[in-house]
């Protein structure tokens, strides 16, 4: 068996989606049609959930840089810092959950769809399996409530959980060293990163 990423890198806002190009590459050769080729691989989506993303402040910083500088591009040093922070930084609890093989669902897809539409449908199928298997932490529930200014998920975290997460976000904001730091914008981006896994989980399990 082999493991392969669903996309090139993690989404900066934690709204991870399978890239159609990955599926096209997997289905490029073999017997039968696209569905047959993918079914031969017995694909089982794997969901990886992190309590904390050590690169969150770097991602938020990049969001503002791209907003303020239209042609902004990361340097090699930026990439190395992201890799180092991602590998060595604190992630809290990490959960791996393997979904069942998607062959049965693949077999129910309309094989006569134009290939672009078929790959979109397959990507959506994989995404739903991954999102439904996320482990949702208190960080996600608190972030969602803070972002949308509600108390919808208050039963999923304690007052101490909320206080700890707010303190964590404040600390990550302090690590951003932009000269024209837009704190409100950056805070919203940080909260969005932690709220999106819950948003996607709810959509996948309703």
Identify what each model region corresponds to.
Residues 1-2, 9-206:
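Membrane-interfacial terminal anchoring regions of lipid-handling membrane enzymes
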């Amino acid at each position: 068996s082999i493991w392969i990423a669903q996309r090139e890198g993690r989404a900066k806002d934690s709204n991870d989606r399978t890239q159609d190009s990955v599926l096209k590459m997997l289905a490029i050769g073999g017997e039968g049609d696209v569905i047959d080729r993918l079914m031969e691989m017995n694909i089982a989506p794997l969901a990886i959930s992190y309590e904390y993303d050590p690169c969150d402040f770097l991602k938020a910083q990049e969001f503002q840089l791209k907003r303020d500088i239209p042609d902004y591009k990361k340097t090699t040093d930026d990439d190395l810092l992201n890799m180092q922070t991602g590998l060595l930084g604190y992630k809290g609890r990490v959960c791996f959950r393997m979904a069942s093989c998607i062959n049965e669902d693949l077999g129910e897809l309309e094989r006569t769809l134009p290939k672009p539409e078929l790959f979109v449908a397959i990507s959506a199928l994989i995404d739903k399996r991954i999102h439904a298997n996320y482990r949702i932490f208190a960080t996600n529930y608190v972030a969602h409530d803070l972002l949308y200014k509600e108390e919808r998920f208050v039963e999923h975290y304690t007052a101490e959980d909320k206080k700890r997460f707010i303190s964590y976000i404040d600390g990550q904001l302090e690590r951003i060293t932009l000269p024209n730091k837009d704190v409100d914008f950056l805070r919203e981006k940080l909260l969005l990163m932690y709220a999106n896994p819950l948003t996607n989980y709810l959509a996948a399990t309703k």
